[in-house]
């Protein structure tokens, strides 16, 4: 079975029996590179034979040379514009544009013009440069030589290339009827399809690659988690990246002399923020001074930090004294750290909050199990844990194939020291999940930095879940 281009070459060789690759390219209109590959295919089929192969140097027009062949050389155009009469430099510059400097330089070098003040005086009324004549000859197939070739090379109007030339002989004639690609309705109704030869389809070949746009795979994962939470009856809430220490630490019953507040564990922002109503501030102060036994500072509570935990959003929600709520937030948090394959200075967390009158610790465990099973973790277990603002507290583990039991989240019932100053007296369950670590487990990512990659080839290779 022969392709259309193979048939073109064979039809050409039938008339000559023997020809060069360059003659074949000119006679068929095919690119020389295509001719070489088709000849190799035909030779492998035993239809043609390569008699000889040689490499020769050929002169070819550059892109600049092709342009000058069509438009004319700048010095020729300048002489034509002068037409035997003096003209101001500015007039010529306006007419020739960026070609003026080139044309003016070559025209003076060739003695075609002189310059008096700002006026160009022609010394000839007409001029066609030998270089232009050589360019036209080359276009017609006659290569330049000698001094003209040297000038054209210096002016980058031509280039000398090494070109392979094959001499090919037709060994046997074959039927050159083109293969049909499609069966038409007419062929089926008339039965004429039996008279045709059809090009076979390779059903095992990969389809062509189409680089279509798609959602960033990590963003897609986050959206899937959000959809799951909404499906479980939660509402999404959000907060600001810049937060006061009051909501980031104080409302969460974390003392002001806690090491986490030091500059090495939080990004401190210059300036002070505003505090909520004085009643909430007073109650938080009383709780800190009663249980932590130190003098609580309102000025310290007004300090600004880049939030180090999305629990700051939970604290904001609590400050509104909701009677009943099922809320979650997913967002970035910021902590000083050494960046490597498992650590970043900014990453995503998810915090959840449930406030219900009869909510129990057992309900919290059931909710967490529903979340992780919704994410595809079939086996979930719990271990006692400790967190500053929950009691009792629990660590959540999920079984991941190939990794075993992996810590997934921390959770617990919020302490009364956290909820009651905000006016919340119903049980409140809360949890925090490292979304980046979770995504690495589910997506098979080894380096956390790849979750934020902007490398197009890498992103194209990622499967969107």
From Swiss-Prot:
One matching Pfam family: tRNA-synt_2d
Entry cofactors: Mg(2+)
Coarse class of the protein's main subcellular location: cytoplasm
NCBIfam families registered for this protein in UniProt: pheS, PRK04172.1
InterPro entries: aa-tRNA-synth_II, aa-tRNA-synth_II/BPL/LPL, ArsR-like_HTH, Phe-tRNA-synth_IIc_asu, Phe_tRNA_ligase_alpha_bac/arc, Phenylalanyl-tRNA_Synthase, Tscrpt_reg_IclR_N, WH-like_DNA-bd_sf
Gene Ontology biological-process entries: phenylalanyl-tRNA aminoacylation; regulation of DNA-templated transcription
Gene: pheS
UniProt EC number: 6.1.1.20
Name assigned to this protein: Phenylalanine--tRNA ligase alpha subunit
Sequence similarity: Belongs to the class-II aminoacyl-tRNA synthetase family. Phe-tRNA synthetase alpha subunit type 2 subfamily.
List of residues binding L-phenylalanine: 311, 389
Lineage: Archaea, Thermoproteota, Thermoprotei, Sulfolobales, Sulfolobaceae
GO cellular component, one term: cytoplasm
Cofactor: how bound: Binds 2 magnesium ions per tetramer.
Cross-referenced PANTHER family: PHENYLALANINE--TRNA LIGASE ALPHA SUBUNIT, PHENYLALANYL-TRNA SYNTHETASE
Organism: Metallosphaera sedula (strain ATCC 51363 / DSM 5348 / JCM 9185 / NBRC 15509 / TH2)
Catalytic activity: tRNA(Phe) + L-phenylalanine + ATP = L-phenylalanyl-tRNA(Phe) + AMP + diphosphate + H(+)
């Amino acid at each position: 079975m022969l392709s259309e281009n193979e048939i073109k070459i064979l039809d050409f060789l039938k008339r000559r029996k023997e020809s060069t690759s360059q003659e074949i390219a000119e006679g068929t209109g095919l690119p020389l590179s295509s001719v070489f590959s088709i000849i190799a295919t035909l030779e492998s089929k035993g239809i043609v034979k390569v008699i000889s192969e040689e490499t020769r140097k050929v002169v070819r027009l550059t892109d600049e040379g092709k342009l000058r062949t069509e438009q004319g050389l700048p010095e020729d155009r300048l002489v034509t514009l002068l037409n035997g009469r003096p003209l101001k430099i500015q007039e010529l510059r306006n007419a020739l544009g960026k070609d003026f400097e080139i044309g003016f330089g070559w025209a003076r070098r060739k003695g075609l013009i002189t310059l008096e003040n700002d006026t160009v005086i022609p010394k000839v009324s007409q001029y066609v440069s030998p270089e232009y004549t050589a360019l036209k000859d080359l276009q017609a197939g006659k290569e330049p030589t000698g001094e003209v070739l040297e000038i054209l090379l210096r002016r980058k109007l031509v280039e000398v290339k090494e070109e392979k030339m094959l001499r090919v002989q037709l060994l046997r004639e074959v039927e050159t009827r083109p293969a049909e690609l499609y069966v038409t309705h007419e062929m089926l109704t008339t039965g004429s399809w039996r008279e045709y030869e059809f090009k076979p389809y390779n059903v095992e070949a990969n389809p062509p690659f189409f680089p279509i746009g798609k959602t960033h795979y990590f963003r897609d994962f986050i959206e899937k988690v959000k959809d799951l939470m909404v499906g479980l009856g939660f509402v999404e809430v959000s907060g600001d990246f810049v937060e006061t220490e009051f909501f980031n630490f104080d409302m969460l019953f974390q003392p002001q002399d806690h090491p986490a507040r030091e500059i090495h564990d939080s990004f401190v922002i210059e300036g002070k923020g505003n505090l909520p109503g004085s009643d909430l501030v007073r109650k938080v102060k009383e709780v800190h001074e009663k249980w932590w036994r130190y003098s609580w500072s309102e000025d310290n509570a007004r300090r600004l930090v880049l939030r180090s935990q999305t629990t700051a959003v939970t604290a904001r929600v609590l400050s509104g004294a909701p009677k009943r709520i099922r809320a979650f937030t997913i967002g970035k948090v910021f902590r000083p750290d050494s960046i490597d394959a498992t650590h970043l200075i900014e990453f995503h967390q998810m915090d959840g909050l449930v406030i219900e009158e009869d909510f129990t610790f057992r309900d919290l465990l059931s909710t967490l199990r529903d979340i992780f099973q919704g994410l595809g973790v079939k086996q979930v277990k719990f271990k006692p844990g400790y967190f500053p603002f929950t009691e009792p507290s629990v660590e959540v583990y999920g079984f991941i194939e190939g990794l075993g039991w992996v810590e997934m989240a921390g959770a617990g019932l919020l302490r009364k020291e956290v909820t009651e100053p905000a006016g919340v007296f119903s049980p409140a369950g809360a949890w925090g999940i490292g979304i980046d670590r979770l995504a690495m487990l589910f997506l098979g990512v080894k380096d956390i930095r790849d979750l934020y990659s902007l490398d197009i080839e890498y992103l194209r290779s990622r499967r969107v879940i």
